């Protein structure tokens, strides 16, 4: 009986071998055969949308393999001829096979896939069990119809038993044009060589790949081999369009992300530190901040064992060991290890000084310089020496001061071998060469050090930014203000070791010590 138009069976896309042909295939060829059969099955099953379980009854007659099944009121009879071979059961007879189909469509598919692998797996044992026997035909048919595609299992009359099989419905959701409508030819050479590898199996494999992505997304152009995957993919586009910021129009694929983004506009900071009361817009920022209180430093450098609160700090630190400087200046080609360093450097080329002092109007290119300068007006000195309790407005000044106690002088002049406690004073080397690169544009006076030029230039500008809070007197240098301030406080930090007399200024102490040394003053 001819199959109705549009009906497709698994046999239509299967390659069938006789027992003799099968025994002549090597293990690699049998593995390839199994893979192709499994791939055919996957592509047929992918056309299904909502499968349900169905019980079918199979029987056979002595005249041949004649299948009779009942599904509702539908009945169909198909005749098949012996002599060809599709799948081999190695371990046991077909009547012991039981397909445990679950109501879940996916589980049902996996069960059949597992069974097919069993049927085509251990071929060596088949050769032992069936050596000398007549050809046995285990055919797995898979029929598709616009209303009721069915799964069939064919067997010889000796091994027929009731089988549990799966029926796949709703194939009408897929157009006939998307179904597989041709059966590939089987080519076997006389010597059972590799002809079939180069013909039928590879032809089928190519056809499978051509059919794999027949369902295409209109939005992104991405294609899938079944409609269910396409619908799942389309939810991504739906999600992207669902969550939109009503302030700036930016879109997100998660409601949580858009809620977090809106805090940038509203300034909301719902996460509060219980230690200091500081608030944050994200829990991640709060978690990182808490490490400052707990002292936790989970990120450790493998080179020097130095630890950090934040991962970003560790990444920057590692560049010290690697020498990496990924940020390059387009003007002069100089490279930097941090982006902030490059930003500050660029201002040397542009002349930009975005930080302005409201007290004196002086501008700065770096925020750190502006912060230090502002302490001149406020008198703030947050850095304190643990040895003598002296305070400083700059951290670098405290560092230099500590070397007075430790007598450390790490900077050495290559010309004369003299050592210094500050890197700036190392420039004393210019005294050997007589070099004076810093020249005043007003009077052409030159200096070896830039700091001396800046002090000199205040004579022309009459700039005295440093003011005494006691008497209102102004000075051009911080050191001058410091010395003047001792007149009000009576502080005398310089003490003679011989007579314990103290002085406000170091120069006065040096003059006093000449009494003991006998050194005469220069006239």
UniProtKB/Swiss-Prot annotation:
| SUPFAM superfamilies attached to this UniProt entry | beta-beta-alpha zinc fingers, KRAB domain (Kruppel-associated box)
Q: What subcellular compartments does it reside in?
A: Nucleus
Q: Where is this protein primarily located?
A: nucleus
**Limits of the KRAB domain:** 8-81
GO MF annotations, alphabetized: DNA-binding transcription factor activity, RNA polymerase II-specific; RNA polymerase II cis-regulatory region sequence-specific DNA binding; zinc ion binding
* Annotated crosslink Glycyl lysine isopeptide (Lys-Gly) (interchain with G-Cter in SUMO2) location: 205
Q: Where are the zinc fingers (C2H2-type)?
A: 215-237, 243-265, 271-293, 299-321, 327-349, 355-377, 383-405, 411-432, 438-460, 466-488, 494-516
InterPro entries on file: KRAB, KRAB_dom_sf, Znf_C2H2-type, Znf_C2H2_sf, Znf_C2H2_type
Question: Into which family does the record put it?
Answer: Belongs to the krueppel C2H2-type zinc-finger protein family.
The name this protein carries in UniProt is Zinc finger protein 765
Q: Which organism is it from?
A: Homo sapiens
Gene designation per UniProt: ZNF765
């Amino acid at each position: 009986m001819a199959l109705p138009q549009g009906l497709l069976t698994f046999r239509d896309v299967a390659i069938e071998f006789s027992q003799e042909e099968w025994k002549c295939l090597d293990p690699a060829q049998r593995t390839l055969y199994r893979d192709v059969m499994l791939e055919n099955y996957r592509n047929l099953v992918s056309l299904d949308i909502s499968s349900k379980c169905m019980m079918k009854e199979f029987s056979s007659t002595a005249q041949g393999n004649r299948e009779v099944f009942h599904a509702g009121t539908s009945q169909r009879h198909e005749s098949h001829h012996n002599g060809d071979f599709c799948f081999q059961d190695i371990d046991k007879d077909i009547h012991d096979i039981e397909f445990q189909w679950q109501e879940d469509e996916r589980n049902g598919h996996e069960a059949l896939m597992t069974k097919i692998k069993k049927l085509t797996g251990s071929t060596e044992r088949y050769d032992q069990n069936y050596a000398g026997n007549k050809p046995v035909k285990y055919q797995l048919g898979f029929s598709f119809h616009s209303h009721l595609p069915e799964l069939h299992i064919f067997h010889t009359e000796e091994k027929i038993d009731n089988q549990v099989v799966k029926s796949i419905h709703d194939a009408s959701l897929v157009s006939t044009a998307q179904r597989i409508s041709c059966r590939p030819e089987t080519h076997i050479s006389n010597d059972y060589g590799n002809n079939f590898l180069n013909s039928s199996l590879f032809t089928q494999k190519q056809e499978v790949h051509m059919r794999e992505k027949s369902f295409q997304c209109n939005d992104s152009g991405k294609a899938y081999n079944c409609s269910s995957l396409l619908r799942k993919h389309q939810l991504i586009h739906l999600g992207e369009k669902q969550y939109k910021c009503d302030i700036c129009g930016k879109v997100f694929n998660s409601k949580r992300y858009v809620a977090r983004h809106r805090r940038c506009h509203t300034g909301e900071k719902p996460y509060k530190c219980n230690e200091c009361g500081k608030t944050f817009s994200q829990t991640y920022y709060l978690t990182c901040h808490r490490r400052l209180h707990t002292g936790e430093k989970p990120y450790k450098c493998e080179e020097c064992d130095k630890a950090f609160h934040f991962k970003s700090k560790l990444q920057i630190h590692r560049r010290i060991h690697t020498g990496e400087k990924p940020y390059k200046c387009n003007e002069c080609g100089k490279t930097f290890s941090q982006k902030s360093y490059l930003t500050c450097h660029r201002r040397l080329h542009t002349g930009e000084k975005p930080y302005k002092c409201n007290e004196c109007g002086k501008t700065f290119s770096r925020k750190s310089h502006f912060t230090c300068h502002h302490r001149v007006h406020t008198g703030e000195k947050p850095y304190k020496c643990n040895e003598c309790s002296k305070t400083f407005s700059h951290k670098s000044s405290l560092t230099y001061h500590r070397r007075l106690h430790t007598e450390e002088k790490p900077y050495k002049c290559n010309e004369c071998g003299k050592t210094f406690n500050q890197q700036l004073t190392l420039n004393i080397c210019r005294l050997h060469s007589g070099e004076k690169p810093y020249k005043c544009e007003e009077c052409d006076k030159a200096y070896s050090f830039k700091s001396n030029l800046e002090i000199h230039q205040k004579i022309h500008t009459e700039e005295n930014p440093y003011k005494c809070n006691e008497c209102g007197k102004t000075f051009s240098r911080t050191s001058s203000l410091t010395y003047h301030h001792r007149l009000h406080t009576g502080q005398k930090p310089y003490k003679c070791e011989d007579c314990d007399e103290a002085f406000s200024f170091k120069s006065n102490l040096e003059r006093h010590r000449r009494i003991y040394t006998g050194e005469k003053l220069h006239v």
